[in-house]
Curated annotation (Swiss-Prot):
Belongs to the GTP cyclohydrolase II family. It comes from Shewanella pealeana (strain ATCC 700345 / ANG-SQ1). The gene is ribA. The active site is at D126, R128. It catalyses: GTP + 4 H2O = 2,5-diamino-6-hydroxy-4-(5-phosphoribosylamino)-pyrimidine + formate + 2 phosphate + 3 H(+). GO terms for molecular function: GTP binding; GTP cyclohydrolase II activity; zinc ion binding. This is GTP cyclohydrolase-2.
Length: 209
């Protein structure tokens, strides 16, 4: 495994002080981060999330996706729980990178959905891999998880690496008029587990101009 632990530091946030653990992939040069909160109870399932980098949603407040909303909600949920973790993986644009993501957005502006846009650019709908989580989970000392996700691929990935997913915790937040079609495509074509109302009703607070 090419993932190497580098260092840890405190990370004050609006929800409390997390611990930030840095990792480097010597093969790809990518730098991944694990956030932990609180003291983990031995042998207990820990609330957590695998979150792939989304610069537009996480840092630029884009309403085209639900990523930033999911990240903030996950951090808030963990703080309220008193313990938990987030693995922040550098897999922008479901693994195609930032510039290709912008190219995909350009195609979406012309009418393609998120899956069609990736495929027109020559990519699979979802290019992400999750093998880098193995040493990250070992480092933070977690092997039983209550996983915050709507994506069954993340559940299967954890299970395939010998991690026990005790519970899948839905994370259905961030719906608005700009991402309604995106959420529906994630549900109908990518297999994300979302309730019908999540991608058919518009958030009136976001809908105001």
């Amino acid at each position: 495994m090419s993932i190497k632990y580098i260092a840890s530091s405190k990370l004050p946030t609006p929800w409390g002080v997390f611990e930030m653990h840095g990792f480097e992939d010597s093969e790809t040069g990518k730098e991944h981060v694990a956030l932990t909160f609180g003291t983990f109870t031995p042998d207990a399932p820990i609330l957590g999330r695998i979150h792939s980098e989304c610069l537009t949603g996480d840092a630029l407040f884009s309403l085209r996706c639900d990523c930033g909303f999911q990240l903030q909600t996950a951090m808030q949920n963990i703080a309220e729980e008193g313990q938990g973790f987030i693995l922040y993986l550098r897999q922008e644009g479901r693994g195609i990178g930032l510039l290709n993501k912008i190219r995909a957005y350009e195609l979406q502006d012309q009418g393609a959905n998120t899956v069609e846009a990736n495929e027109r650019l020559g990519f699979e709908a979802d290019m992400r891999k999750y093998d880098m989580i193995i040493p990250m989970m070992e480092k933070i000392g977690v092997d039983k998880v209550r996983l915050m996700t709507n994506n069954p691929r993340k559940v299967k990935a954890m299970q395939s690496f010998g991690l026990e997913v005790v519970e899948r915790v839905p994370l259905q937040v961030g719906k608005n008029r700009y991402n309604e079609g995106y959420l529906k495509t994630k549900s109908t074509q990518l297999g994300h587990m979302m309730s019908e109302h999540h991608f058919t009703e518009t958030d009136p607070e976001v809908d105001k101009d």
